[in-house]
Amino acid sequence: MADDPQRNFRSAYYEKVGFRGVEEKKSLEILLKDNPLDVEKLSTFSQRFPLPSMYRIHVWKVLLGILPPHSDSHALVRQYRVDQFEDVSCALTVMRFIHASTPQTEIYLRMFQLENHTLPRRTELRPPDAEDENFLAIARAMEEIVDDPVDCFWLVRCFINQFKHKFGDSIPHLPKSLEHFLSQEDVCLLSHLKASGALALLPYSLWFRRCFAGCLPESSLQRVWDKVISGSCKILVFVAVEILLSHKIVIMGMNQPDAIYHFLSNMPQENTDAIVTKAIDLWHKYCGTPMHSV
């Protein structure tokens, strides 16, 4: 999809008349007709453009390896996923870890623990630790995006596994990245956060380990997850930066770190779509726009 004047004119026209993304949707449909699917091109597309809602879950499944590139195998692999889900669920029921009234997200957690050999003994069951809470937050958010419980489990499982595998070493460095980019955008706000002692106490776990699950409404969250699933954890930094910039007036009026932490952990749900849009623009500004060709 090389840049050319005719395409740029059409894109500008479509956006002006309210059909932003028409060409991008057509390009994605072409990519989805490939057999086998080109995972790298799908990933680059997802980095560069918003995914249409009608294709989002399918693209996520391919990028996360839930479905293979060969479309001919999708029905068979889907059945394997269903069978495995039912087998693990049945095993947990027999072991009396779950029952009819167990919340679905807790079932996902126990299934995840069983697969990863971290399932505690029934006699040693404890309240969820921080890692469990991160899992449950992501699972609750995914439940709002995906209706089917089998799809939901596999998406949560593979999302978390990929996130840890790809970005585990990068996560501890994201707060420093936030400080750097905030210094580029608003030195005054950064100085206030430092002077108040709030910079070290921002809700980093909510932002960078739960990937904003429980912070942003799902309509905004899924646009952030498009970028994470397709290979960027840096987008999380720019969403955090834009949240701080968007609520600057409120934050500048607070001097207690606890008050700032509480406000950001329970931030207003209005205008989150605009925040995410600005964050993506900021991300492209500093990190560039991946090139993509159909």
UniProtKB/Swiss-Prot annotation:
A GO cellular-component term linked to this record? TSC1-TSC2 complex
Arranged from A to Z, the UniProt key words for this protein are: Cytoplasm, Cytoplasmic vesicle, GTPase activation, Lysosome, Membrane
Q: Which domain of life is it from?
A: Eukaryota
Which Pfam families does this UniProt record tie to the protein?
A: RabGAP-TBC
Q: What subcellular compartments does it reside in?
A: Lysosome membrane; Cytoplasmic vesicle; Cytoplasm, Cytosol
Q: Name one GO biological process term.
A: negative regulation of TOR signaling
Q: Residue ranges of the Rab-GAP TBC domain?
A: 50-232
Query: What is this protein for, i.e. what is its function?
Result: Non-catalytic component of the TSC-TBC complex, a multiprotein complex that acts as a negative regulator of the canonical mTORC1 complex, an evolutionarily conserved central nutrient sensor that stimulates anabolic reactions and macromolecule biosynthesis to promote cellular biomass generation and growth. The TSC-TBC complex acts as a GTPase-activating protein (GAP) for the small GTPase RHEB, a direct activator of the protein kinase activity of mTORC1.
> Which PANTHER family does this entry report, sorted A to Z?
TBC1 DOMAIN FAMILY MEMBER 7 (PTHR13530:SF3)
Can you name this protein? TBC1 domain family member 7
Q: Organism source for this protein?
A: Danio rerio (Zebrafish)
